[in-house]
Amino acid sequence: QGIASALAAGAVAAQMGTAFILCPESAANASYRENLLSVRAGETRLTSVFSGRPARGMVNRLVRYGEADGSPVPADYPLADDAAKQLNALAATSGCHEFAAQWAGQGAALSRALPAADLVDVLMTELNHVQG
């Protein structure tokens, strides 16, 4: 229905990157996949904490800290991006993935773990059904 809504609103296409993160062809790590299958997928927001530029992602510890009252404003891109990647890499060595940029759109909770070709077929079938 999301694709049909975008097209009905005048768009010529719909961006659906998040829909493909759970596909086996994706390079997403296990933590990213687990979060997309959890309640976390229902809480996304635009933030510039990770990169210094606004982008939508799942809320984690870094987002909560970086957006809290009194937190410093993120550095401009690419400094914020480099710093966040280094912080995440260090935390990940201890098994902590609370500092990873896990980008996700507003429909993240609708993600499905299907091979990419199958997902495209399903999305087209659903679009055709909605459009009648």
Regions found by a protein language model. Name each.
Residues 2-132:
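Conserved active-site-proximal phosphate/metal-binding subdomains
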